């Protein structure tokens, strides 16, 4: 719910998937429908078409926040919807150093994401994710089919092996702002970008980093 000003699920449901009727849109555009009721409407339209509603949470706002807001370290989407829905929650995680290196490539975060602030948020997120279950991004790039099968099983969804032929051209997704995904055309592990000794020291010296590795079941420190 915190990201509505940037990414609107109602707009996505209408424009990406054609789920909403004109009467639905009129009701939503009146501004009188609470967030949970809007999601319930989308879920109802999914059910009518034998589809399953999957919500991809933007946990950055809840646990890191910068540069948009200060985090409060709570899964606000889940807390907002728990009363109305029986949620199945699951997390995908990446090595915290690689995640930081990826974030700071984006001009929004470069020079605005101190290591200490970032690691506190990631550690708090990892504490939450231990309760939902998680899988590693690195496992997916190493063995896409087996890892995606695990994710589908956790979410009680059928596995579609045809995803390999379609993923690179799939555009109905937010956050895919950096070039290269469709150009590569295959799912593969990439080498870690050079960090330098100073960055490695800044991470390894912090208890939040070491605790996050434990919570996320990473056995290394700064190696990918």
Per-range role (PLM):
Residues 30, 139, 200-204:
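A general boundary/transition motif marking the beginning of the first structured unit of a protein
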Residues 222-224:
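C-terminal non-catalytic accessory extensions
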């Amino acid at each position: 719910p915190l990201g509505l000003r940037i990414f609107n699920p109602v707009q996505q449901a209408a424009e990406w998937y054609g789920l909403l009727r004109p009467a639905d849109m009129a009701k939503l555009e009146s501004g009188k429908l609470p967030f949970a009721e809007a999601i319930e409407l989308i879920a109802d339209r999914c059910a009518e078409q034998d589809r399953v509603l999957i919500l991809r949470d933007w946990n950055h706002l809840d646990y890191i926040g910068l540069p948009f807001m200060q985090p409060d370290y709570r899964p606000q989407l889940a807390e907002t919807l728990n009363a109305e829905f029986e949620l199945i929650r699951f997390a995908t995680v990446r090595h915290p150093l690689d995640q930081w290196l990826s974030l700071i490539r984006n001009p929004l975060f470069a020079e605005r994401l101190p290591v200490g602030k970032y690691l506190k948020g990631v550690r708090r997120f990892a504490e939450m994710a231990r309760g939902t279950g998680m899988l590693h991004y690195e496992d997916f790039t190493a063995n896409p089919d087996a890892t995606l099968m695990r994710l589908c099983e956790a979410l009680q969804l059928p596995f579609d092996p045809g995803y390999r032929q379609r993923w690179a051209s799939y555009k109905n997704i937010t956050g895919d702002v950096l070039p290269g995904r469709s150009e590569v055309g295959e799912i593969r592990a990439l080498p870690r970008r050079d960090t330098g000794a100073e960055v490695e020291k800044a991470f390894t010296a912090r208890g939040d980093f070491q605790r996050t590795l434990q919570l996320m079941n990473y056995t290394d420190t700064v190696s990918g």
